[in-house]
């Protein structure tokens, strides 16, 4: 089925304040996040390449040792196995693209 209504996908709270709806293809995962102000994902890393796209609000993102507050229209490219963390400065919506598929989000 090539067409998806993201609103029909049940959200999954991965950590408190980070709720995601996930779309999977054969090779990629797209995560539609709703992030609450003050919610954080601590430093972590994974084998997946990741592209971050802020849609609304503000997100503080640290990649390696560099930190920036991203606003709507801004993003970041995070290579495989690079430590990163994120905090909602405001309530925000973010779309992340992962390669390869995030099997841990595929349930």
Each model region followed by its residue ranges:
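Ligand-binding loop in jelly-roll beta-barrel domains
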Residues: 80-104
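A cytosolic small-molecule/anion-sensing beta-strand core signal
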Residues: 55-56, 71-72, 90
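Short, conserved beta-strand element in jelly-roll/cupin
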Residues: 34-35, 46-61
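Short strand-coil-strand connectors
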Residues: 26, 62-66
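Short acidic-glycine-tyrosine-enriched beta hairpin
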Residues: 65-80
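A short, N-terminal "cap"/entry segment at the start of jelly-roll beta-barrel domains
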Residues: 1-27, 107
């Amino acid at each position: 089925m090539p067409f998806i209504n993201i609103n029909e996908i049940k959200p999954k709270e991965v950590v408190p304040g980070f709720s995601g709806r996930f779309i999977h293809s054969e090779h990629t995962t797209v995560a539609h996040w709703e992030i609450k102000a003050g919610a954080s994902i601590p430093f972590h890393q994974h084998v997946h390449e990741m592209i971050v796209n802020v849609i609304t609000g503000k997100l503080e993102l640290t990649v390696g040792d560099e930190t920036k507050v991203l606003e709507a229209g801004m993003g970041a490219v995070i290579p495989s196995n690079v430590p990163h963390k994120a905090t909602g400065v405001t309530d925000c919506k973010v779309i992340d693209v992962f390669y390869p598929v995030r099997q841990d989000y595929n349930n």
